[in-house]
Regions:
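Active-site neighborhood of phospho(di)ester-bond hydrolases with catalytic His/Asp-centered motifs
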Residues: 5-7, 29-34, 68-72, 120-121, ...
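Conserved beta-sheet core of the metallophosphoesterase superfamily
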Residues: 175-238
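Active-site-proximal loop/helix segment associated with metal-binding centers of metalloenzymes
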Residues: 91-95, 109-186
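Flexible, charged surface loops at secondary-structure boundaries
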Residues: 22-25, 62, 114, 183-189
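Active-site environment of divalent metal-dependent phosphoester hydrolases
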Residues: 10-14, 37-39, 73-79, 126-128, ...
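Core catalytic region of metal-dependent phosphoesterases/phosphodiesterases
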Residues: 6, 11-101
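Internal, conserved structured core segments that host functional sites
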Residues: 73-86, 106-124
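Short aromatic-enriched loop/helix-cap "lid" or pocket-rim segments at secondary-structure transitions
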Residues: 79-83, 131-134, 206
């Protein structure tokens, strides 16, 4: 299956061109989360309108084709989040907060998506976090139902076990963990596809590294707003520049 992957949007509409060009040649479109907090002085109204365009795309192409993951810059606008983090805008909270609450409640915004051994989430799923928060006897199919039931399982963890304020710790959730910690402690026997940590793909041809479980870790948060097409049969990922 071919999947169009749209990395962290951060209030931009860069995704529209990639979707328009590729929507008919792919089976799925996965948005990796972080729809808000651009840090580039985009007005909250423009940001919210752009987010609603993504929702309209999902309605137009179908809920099965368009997958919307949640990121940390979305979660902190919900009523479930106990903290506020970098980029937080009170105006965005007023405009979008209740909508985001509803989208979590109705399952539109999900924590993960899995297909044929490829596991998508905003930042990655660690073995440690999964066992602590989902359960040792659980499976990936349990992640989204439990998140919908108890959204605070993704809160940033700040205690004696999580010394990194950057989130580079195996106890952090799929909206917070960083690549180093994830690579050393990946959940299960899955390739993982993540956003969250930005990379410059302008001078490189590969968007992946190998994790400690021998599987690939694909990065999708591009400083230049590239998108990606993943072929789940071959494992190849095309960078759309």
């Amino acid at each position: 299956m071919k999947i169009l992957i749209i990395g962290d949007v951060h209030e931009s509409d860069f995704w529209t061109e990639h979707v328009q060009k590729n929507k008919d040649s792919v089976e799925k479109i996965v948005f990796m989360g972080d729809y808000f907090d651009s840090f580039k002085k985009v007005s909250a109204q423009v940001a919210f309108e752009n987010f609603k365009k993504i929702l309209a795309l999902r309605e137009s192409l179908g809920n099965e084709k368009v997958i919307m993951l949640i990121g940390n810059h979305d979660f902190h606008y919900t009523k479930f989040c106990m903290g506020r983090y970098s980029g937080f805008s009170t105006t965005t909270f007023v405009l979008a907060g209740s909508s985001l609450d509803e989208l979590v409640d109705n399952g539109t915004l999900v924590l993960s998506y899995e297909y044929d051994g490829y596991l998508f989430s905003h930042a990655g799923v660690s073995e440690t976090w999964f066992k602590e928060m989902i359960g040792e006897d659980s499976s990936v199919e349990d992640i989204n139902p439990l998140f919908k039931q108890s959204p605070r399982i993704v809160e940033f963890r700040n205690d004696e076990r999580t010394t990194s304020q950057y989130g580079d710790n195996e106890h952090q959730s799929p909206i917070w963990i960083r690549p180093n910690a994830l690579s050393e402690n990946p959940y299960g026997d899955y390739h993982q596809i993540v956003g969250h940590t930005a990379f410059d793909f302008s001078n490189i041809d590969s968007d992946r590294v190998t994790m400690d479980n021998g599987k690939n870790l694909y990065f999708t948060d591009s400083n230049q707003h590239e998108a990606f097409i993943l072929d789940t049969v071959t494992g190849e990922s095309e960078i759309l520049r």
